[in-house]
Amino acid sequence: LVPFLGKTLGGLLARF
């Protein structure tokens, strides 16, 4: 799993 995916997931979670 690339860090980009993790960053995106984290951003989505933080947004919601």
UniProtKB/Swiss-Prot annotation:
Q: Which residues carry this modification: Phenylalanine amide?
A: F16
Q: Which GO terms describe its biological process?
A: defense response to bacterium; innate immune response
Where, subcellularly, is it found?
Secreted
Q: Give a yes or no for keyword Secreted in this entry.
A: yes
Q: Which UniProt keywords apply?
A: Amidation, Amphibian defense peptide, Antibiotic, Antimicrobial, Immunity, Innate immunity, Secreted
Major place of localization? secreted
Q: Which domain of life is it from?
A: Eukaryota
Range of residues in the leader sequence:
none
Does Secreted count among this protein's keywords?
A: yes
- Write out the tissue specificity statement of the associated record: Expressed by the skin glands.
Q: What GO CC terms are in its UniProt record?
A: extracellular region
- Job of this protein: Antimicrobial peptide.
- Protein family: Belongs to the frog skin active peptide (FSAP) family. Temporin subfamily.
Name recorded for this polypeptide? Temporin-1Tq
Q: Tell me the organism.
A: Rana temporaria
Give the taxonomic lineage as stored in the record.
Answer: Eukaryota, Metazoa, Chordata, Craniata, Vertebrata
